[in-house]
Amino acid sequence: SCGFSTTHVPLTHPVAAAKQAATIDHISGGRFGLNIVCGWFKNEFEMFGAEWRTHDERYEYGVEWLDLVRQLWSHSKEFDFDGKYFNAKNLWSEPKPLQSPFPPIMNAGGSPAGQHFAATQAEMNFVILRDHGVEGGKAQIDNLKEMARNSGREVQSWIHGYVVCRDTQKEADDYLEHYVRAKGDYVAVDNLLEIFGMQSETLAPEALDTFRFHFIAGHGGYPLVGTPERIVDEIGKLMEIGIDGIL
């Protein structure tokens, strides 16, 4: 895949998304994927005048949204759709995606409802490893893949990470500290925390500081910090617990 586009399903009509995605799949020569976000930031819903639904209902909406998209990608003739959230007639979309049967779907659901959505609907789940370590990650990934197998599917687990590679571990650690502590844009991160509702009133100071550090270091990704050998070893550990890819 050459890259993913992200769509917020409550704010994008599935007919438009299906046509846009199929077009991009042709432009990219069949190297396109669609990252689906079921929505969580209420301000965005208000900006678009979209209905604010409960957490689990947003995933239910996402299932129907994706069902309609996939039908548009597969039906050769016009069809009608009568669902809980969408009702449409004379639906039709050409060209169909190059990839068969469909472009891959990614989702970053981490809650029980989100994990179920990813396991039953997506080809890839974007995993946030707890505590930035592999210890608790295996259970997360095993649970996701078991849910997928129980639905007759296979799903990959992906993470995002950041790399600080130097000749020695100390040089890597020192450089990480330098660009985070001395060069980091803490004003921007604090603005982000406020937008996310993660202020000192809701999180302990230590948790806030950890979030700030890893966000500046690499958008909160998994730290791959050290010598080339150390980083290769760490990637190997991630593969052992079931990680299929790193962005």
Question: What is each residue range found by the language model?
Answer:
Residues 33-39, 208-212:
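Non-cysteine beta-strand/loop elements that form the S-adenosyl-L-methionine
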Residues 111-125, 131-135, 143:
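Long hydrophobic segments that form regular secondary structure
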Residues 48, 56-98, 132-241:
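An alpha-helical appendage that flanks or caps ligand/catalytic pockets
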Residues 42-52:
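Acidic/polar active-site rim loop that often engages polyanionic ligands
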Residues 2-5, 32-36, 104-108, 123-128, ...:
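Hydrophobic faces of well-ordered beta-strands that scaffold small-molecule active sites
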Residues 27, 120-121, 241:
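Structural motif
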Residues 16-20, 108-117, 227-237:
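Short, acidic/polar
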Residues 9-26:
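Glycine-rich anion/phosphate-binding loops
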